[in-house]
Amino acid sequence: MFGFNLCVVLVAVFSLSKCSARFVYSCKYPPSQWCSSEDIAAECGVLEQCMKYNSTKAADKVKVSLYYESLCPGCRMFLTSQLVPTLIMLQDIMEIDLVPYGNAQETQAQGKYIFTCQHGEDECLGNMIETCMLNKLGLDAVMVIFCMESGNDVLKSAQPCLGVYRPDVTWDSIMQCVKGDQGNKLMHENAVKTDALNPPHQYVPWITVNGEHTDDLQDKAMGSLFSLVCSLYKGQKPAACTLGLKKNTNNYCMN
């Protein structure tokens, strides 16, 4: 909890009148460690100043990673009714990572990766489109994918959704990635990332929070991701956290 980045900041915050010579001479720690813990801050006579300093620092954002499939009903429900709405309301305290792959299988033939998806070839195409969008559009891809997954037909919605949220990006540029070596490589990276999960995923949507997956975190995320993010954020809670957003989405595609 206690910690800081720059000694210069401490010099500015802690005036000589507050940090008396008596404390400075009795402190065996360098200034770079004064706010590293309450005990050290107290020993060096700067506890009050460290409390004030740390209270002004922005806490780390809560990172939510979603391992999913483009045509899995449970994945679509969680992404559209929980993940993206929560991100919109809590974007100052959370970040997300989308990994389209899920329960797919990967083999290699003639120097290329071949993917077999749980919900057929259409899902493999959807996964690849969303992967290429994430690579090309960055965070802007989230709303395009939200639009796709909200539609009756994910694949038919892809091009119109891109036109709505990123009209400056051509559909041809996305499909060039999808059909080329770049898309194949990116999907392989998703496969490696998914297969490296610890514990291994057993179903999708599979959710990790700050890199961790437990049954309890999964249940809380599926029950109310909004409440979970608010509860885990260690900084000052945004006003939105007092409102609440609850929608249970316990629907899975088993591995």
UniProtKB/Swiss-Prot annotation:
pH dependence: Optimum pH is 4-5.
Induction: Up-regulated in spleen and kidney in response to bacterial lipopolysaccharide (LPS).
Cellular component aspect of the GO annotation: extracellular region; lysosome
Subcellular location: Secreted; Lysosome
Biological process terms in GO annotation: cell redox homeostasis; hematopoietic stem cell proliferation; immune system process
Tissue expression as described in the entry: Strongly expressed in spleen and kidney. Also detected at lower levels in heart, liver, intestine and muscle.
Glycosylation site residues: N54
Keyword Lipid biosynthesis: no
Domain of life according to the entry: Eukaryota
Disulphide bridges: C72-C75
GO molecular function, one term: oxidoreductase activity, acting on a sulfur group of donors, disulfide as acceptor
Signal peptide: 1-21
Subunit structure: Dimer; disulfide-linked.
Name under which the protein is recorded: Gamma-interferon-inducible lysosomal thiol reductase
Name of the coding gene: ifi30
